[in-house]
């Protein structure tokens, strides 16, 4: 819930401008935004089936960057901030494990192009500028396949 709550707050304050979400978030009180976040966090995550072709080499490349970074490109390991299991560090560092790959690529691309600036100290913007589209896809496809205990509900 904390990540969605932060995003709604960022939409409401215009730190994350969006033609659709900004007016919606601005129409909600802080308590309403927290309630919406809690509601969505309580929903069981759907079964996720991987679509499309992704090579084992791409997933291995993503895992390597996630765990060790890419010193030659000046990329730190994702695990340095997002944790060894990719579950993040609330409230400022979101989880990556189990996240939709296309969503992650989109966010990284927006940081790279300077469209997002709501990350702490501009850290993700600086990192994304050093990434190739292939790096973004590899990391995103890797984390898509990492189980996240925070979002995986017990079916019982």
Predicted features by range, described:
Residues 30-32, 56, 66-71, 79, ...:
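C-type cytochrome heme-c attachment and multiheme electron-transfer modules
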Residues 36, 75-85, 139:
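The canonical Cys-X-X-Cys-His
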């Amino acid at each position: 819930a904390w990540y969605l709550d932060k995003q709604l707050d960022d939409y409401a304050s215009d730190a994350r401008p969006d033609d659709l979400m900004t007016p919606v978030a601005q129409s909600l009180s802080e308590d309403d935004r927290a309630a919406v976040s809690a509601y969505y966090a309580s929903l069981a995550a759907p079964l996720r089936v991987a679509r499309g072709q992704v090579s084992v080499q791409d997933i291995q490349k993503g895992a390597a960057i996630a765990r060790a970074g890419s010193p030659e490109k000046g990329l730190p390991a994702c695990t340095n901030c997002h944790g060894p299991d990719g579950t993040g560090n609330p409230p400022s560092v979101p989880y990556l494990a189990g996240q939709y790959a296309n969503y992650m690529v989109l966010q990284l691309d927006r940081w790279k192009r300077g469209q997002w600036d709501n990350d702490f100290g501009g850290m993700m913007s600086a990192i994304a500028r050093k990434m190739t589209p292939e790096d973004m896809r590899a990391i995103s496809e890797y984390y898509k396949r990492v189980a996240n205990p925070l979002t995986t509900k017990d079916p019982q």
